[in-house]
């Protein structure tokens, strides 16, 4: 029988709506002896059963719910069922877009809190970000090895958020033999080089797939400035769509080298592509001072806010960079701008860009609102899963 955790009066409402987190300040008491990662039953103050999850005593989120089904045990078969369901939910997308790289498990939104798994061709990359996920590591790897026998399994749990769970950063091979890096994945007929050992996150930003395709609609015969380009995939889509010129900007020389490789593996000539190792904030100001302009600008910056205390600063940062980008666009040009900060509400992000347009003395029209690709689902009871917000604006 699992240890029981009783909530304070009135703190059961979020779990009754199937939100999977129990915060430390909502717990009344713990009945039984617990080790970190142990499975616990959560009950309301009046004793009625709410859910079954993993105990994480050092985290502000002290329980992450595995299941809201009282009859469901947390064992190897549980993880196998969840992974099979997630794969089935992505099969149509894989066929439609010809994907060999996709998100297999999107943590809470796939019913596996703290677990992210991305598939890059014949490599599965895991991030285990919670105590419960860490404790079940061997079982998760065993299930993946059964379901994907031709895949190597590599861990990229080298993230600061593990510290909040009392866990050390870790990465390395968990199963099989890792192929030579980079691996090549495909999406929408485009090949992309991914280094799962050195790349950002698990190796690549799969969540922007649909937005890369969206951007390609606006670039034929146009000049494109691709800011925070990482491995240049917005620029890659633009090159294939017939952009007249492309400038890929990133502070990482390694990322720009991969951007060049991506052009080569797709058989594309990059004579009209400029690779600029530079600080985007400084470069945009320089271009404004020089009077340089573009037809299309992509702004895909890193996360500006990791916690609520940083949100005001993030708002100022987003407003500043969007204002300068708007000043660099030719009349009739297009801005594609993104925020990957989960704490940034979509409506607030749109207001920030609108305010930036006022300061830039430019008239804009919002023509698309963008989000993460559909292999990054948002659980109906887990709005925190909606983290990527994007806007397409026509600029006059």
Curated annotation (Swiss-Prot):
InterPro entries: PUA, PUA-like_sf, PUA_sf, RLMI, RlmI-like_PUA, SAM-dep_methyl-trfase, SAM-dependent_MTases_sf. Residues 2-79 form the PUA domain. PROSITE patterns: PUA. It holds the Pfam family PUA_3. Keywords: Cytoplasm, Methyltransferase, RNA-binding, rRNA processing, S-adenosyl-L-methionine, Transferase. The keyword Cell membrane does not apply. It is an enzyme of class 2 (transferase). GO terms for cellular component: cytoplasm. It is found in: Cytoplasm. Transmembrane segments: none annotated. It catalyses: cytidine(1962) in 23S rRNA + S-adenosyl-L-methionine = 5-methylcytidine(1962) in 23S rRNA + S-adenosyl-L-homocysteine + H(+). Its main location: cytoplasm. Specifically methylates the cytosine at position 1962 (m5C1962) of 23S rRNA. Belongs to the methyltransferase superfamily. RlmI family. HAMAP family: 23SrRNA_methyltr_I. This is Ribosomal RNA large subunit methyltransferase I. It comes from Shewanella sp. (strain MR-7).
